């Protein structure tokens, strides 16, 4: 199936194919998305504009006040009124809703998806854990306000209070049919 994320991101093939055809293949070529250039005897890191293809010095010190909001959680960060927070919000809305669109086609076990993202990509939290930290209902409202589609499974989570809960000392996960089941972990597994 085709998911909305494909429409947003596309494959990027046209940019990449044009770069390869023009010899921009990385360090051994003319550069890539970034390149090191010498100016006045100093090495300067440059970034390629995805719209013009021109290089300009990469601004390593670009900071936004919202960068300090991350410690307060994703919800407060997404609410912060600056360009950095707006960028993060767009990425989170697209990425996390994409993960919810994949259930149950890829897996019906949100815990397995979260674990795979943490182990495979070194994320601190998986996509469904992030949605729970924002609040599933809050996240659904943000998607609606932005004009994005809301996956059915995400609607189920919003109506259920989230993807995870704790009952009788056991972590429970939401299933596509709306029921909660205990998260199964091997006995030898420890989590902190």
What is each stretch, according to the model?
Residues 1-192:
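N-terminal glycine-rich phosphate-binding loop for ADP-containing cofactors
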């Amino acid at each position: 199936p085709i998911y909305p994320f494909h429409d947003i991101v596309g494959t990027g093939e046209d940019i990449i194919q044009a770069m390869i055809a023009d010899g921009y293949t990385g360090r051994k070529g003319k550069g890539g998305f970034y390149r090191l250039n010498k100016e006045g005897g100093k090495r300067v890191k440059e970034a390629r504009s995805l719209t013009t293809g021109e290089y300009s010095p990469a601004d390593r010190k670009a900071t936004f006040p919202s960068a300090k909001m991350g410690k307060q959680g994703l919800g407060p960060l997404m609410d912060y009124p600056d360009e950095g927070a707006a960028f993060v919000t767009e990425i989170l809305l697209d990425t996390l809703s994409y993960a919810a669109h994949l259930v149950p086609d890829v897996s019906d076990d949100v815990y397995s998806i979260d674990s795979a993202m943490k182990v495979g990509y070194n994320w601190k939290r998986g996509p469904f854990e992030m949605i729970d930290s924002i609040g599933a209902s809050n996240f659904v409202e943000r998607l609606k306000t932005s004009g994005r589609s809301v996956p059915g499974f995400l609607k189920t989570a919003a109506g259920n209070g989230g993807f995870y809960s704790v009952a009788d000392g056991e972590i429970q996960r939401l299933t596509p049919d709306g029921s909660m089941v205990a998260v199964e972990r091997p006995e030898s597994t420890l989590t902190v």
